Amino acid sequence: MPPKKKGKRGPSAKTKEKETVRVASEGVTEQTKDFYTVQIRDLEKRLERYQSKWDEICAKEQLKEAQYEQLSNDKKEIVSFLKRTLNQRMDEIADLNDQLLGLQQAKDAEKDAYESQLTQVRHELQDTKERLTSENMLLAGKLASLEEFRVQKEELMGKFAALEEKVKEQEQEHKEAMYILEKKVVLDKDRLKKEMVQRVSTVAAEFRRVSNNQMAETTKRAIRENVSISLQLDKMSDKSIELISENDLLKDRNSELTKQLEMLEENEKELVKNNLSNQKVIRMLTDKCQQQQEILTLLEHTQHALNELQSQHHNLKDESQQLKQKLVSLEDDLQRVTQEKEGLSRQLEEEKQRTLAVDMILSQAAAFLKDMLLTHSEDETEGMQLERRNKMLQQLQLLLDSSATLGLGSSLHEFETKQGHSLKSLKTNRQPVSPVLKGPGVTAHYRIGDLGLVPRQDVSNAVLSKTAMLSKITRLGPLRGTHGISKELLSWTQEEKQIKHSALPEISPGAPSKLLMAK
């Protein structure tokens, strides 16, 4: 209820004012009730659209925030995973670098040791080779001389064997000759003895026979024969002595050749021992050379493994570079998503500002309507009330124009060509204005069918400017051909009440309709 002013007024004045207010209310109700109702419905529909748009924007914002949070979490997880992987790769690279450095140092140390050892072995091998070459040459010379000696030995052994055979044959012949000679000597002695005995006996007989005749001649002849036999025996004895001395010489020669053969056999044994020792040294050097060859093969395998480690190191470096590039691309994607989020945040802020502007416009429109419908002063005259109401409607029009300027509604000129036929029906259904409205100072501004809400352009545009604030959706279809507005059109649905209550908390949902119905 509007506040009452102090002071007492007469019953005639009160009755006159009530009649004036009733007439003005009837005039306002007949001419503006449908306009206010359609405008309120249009504002409610706009509010519903803005509320649905706001809900969509909030849902999109929540979706975008969820997507942004998901992207942020994914980015954080990806970045953490990539950082962890990068750190892992860097640790592996560091470990591989350490291993590579250790292997390189160990390889260098082993290489230096092996090179020094190989150099030393090469020097030793060269010295041994030279020494063995010289010894081999000496041994070759000795072997050649030994071969010559062997040939000579074989020749000498052949000669010695031939000589032994010859000596044996000569010994055998000598023995046989000695035996024959001894036998012959014995036989000759026996024969000579026999002959001598016989001859002695013969000589004795003949001596006895001739002794008597020629004793002296027989004795001389026997003595001469005895002397010749003694000379033959002496010759045979000298021949035997010569054979014995020759046999002794052959035995001495045989003993000397045997001694030389023993010396040559000892030299041959020494040469065989030296040859065996040289073969052992050559075998040892061959084994050592094989060991050095195995060491070189191991070094080659180590070098190959080192090259593989270096290739793995390069591959890990390339993979780390790729991971860094991927991280940079992910950071770029994150920056792009952040920029998109900032753009969406700016759009959201703009939508919030637009929503706030719409809420402010709606609240101001509701406040103006509330002031227009609820404000009632007993001191004001009918012309002042109509003028105040006209100003409020002009302010509402300015609010709607400002909302159209902001892009939140339709402009005034969009309704001029589309809603002209609807406004004609409104003109026919309106009652003529009460004569009370034709007071001084008002007749130039207000006319029949014109509330003066918009500065008058011409007679045809005066009525169109009143409904220019309606949206394109509202076409005044339900109001055609009707003189009054039913209670069903002025009543609020439950959904409109909820939207009205959520958007305009200062105005009760049923206040405008109740006030209009009361008037």
From Swiss-Prot:
Disordered: annotated segments: 1-25
Alphabetical GO biological process terms: sperm axoneme assembly
Family to which this protein belongs: Belongs to the CFAP157 family.
UniProt-recorded Gene Ontology molecular function terms: microtubule binding
Parts forming coiled coils: 28-185, 241-356
Keyword Acyltransferase tagged: no
Protein name listed in UniProt: Cilia- and flagella-associated protein 157
Organism the protein comes from: Xenopus tropicalis (Western clawed frog)
Keyword Glycosyltransferase: no
Tree of life domain: Eukaryota
One Gene Ontology cellular component: ciliary basal body
Subcellular localization(s) per the UniProt record: Cytoplasm, Cytoskeleton, Cilium basal body
Disulfide bridge positions per record: none
Database matches in InterPro entries: CFAP157 (IPR038844)
Principal localisation: cytoplasm
Signal peptide residues on this chain, from the entry's feature table: none
Function: Specifically required during spermatogenesis for flagellum morphogenesis and sperm motility.
Biased composition (Basic residues): 1-11
Keywords: Cell projection, Cilium, Coiled coil, Cytoplasm, Cytoskeleton
